[in-house]
Amino acid sequence: RTGEVIPKSLITRIVNAKNYLAGYYQVRQLDFGELDMAWHTLKAKPKDDTLDFENAALEDYRVLPHFPGTAISTSFGHIFSGGYSAGYYSYKWAEVLEADAFALFQEKGIFDRETAESFRREILSKGDSVDPAVLYRNFRGHEPDSQALMKKLGLV
């Protein structure tokens, strides 16, 4: 309304605030995905209680100490209901695909007609008629790159 340019320092602070704790959030989501897969790849019933199972499943992934007596599994509905059993990782995978695909638009120009047409032709118009991984490679020209998500989050 004033016509003044927003100072670069304010823009930097806004971006930094958006990315605050992004690394922790990413690891937390990966913990959830790992725990989900651990429950759904059991070869036999766990011998120990839920806390022991979780601690074993997540011991290589935790970045913060576990709060004693708490269990994720008992309140994490995605694991056993809601249609996401053994699929929680798909949230993070979708973020990788989005960030990597959008990176091409950023490289070529957000409104680049050729890039938009390629996205429509190679992905949207095919629906579920071709393996999604093939469609993505056809559009992007390479496998999905998780570094695009890390860059988007300001982590690299």
Functional labels for PLM-detected ranges:
Residues R1-V156:
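Cation-handling catalytic/transport regions enriched in His/Asp/Glu
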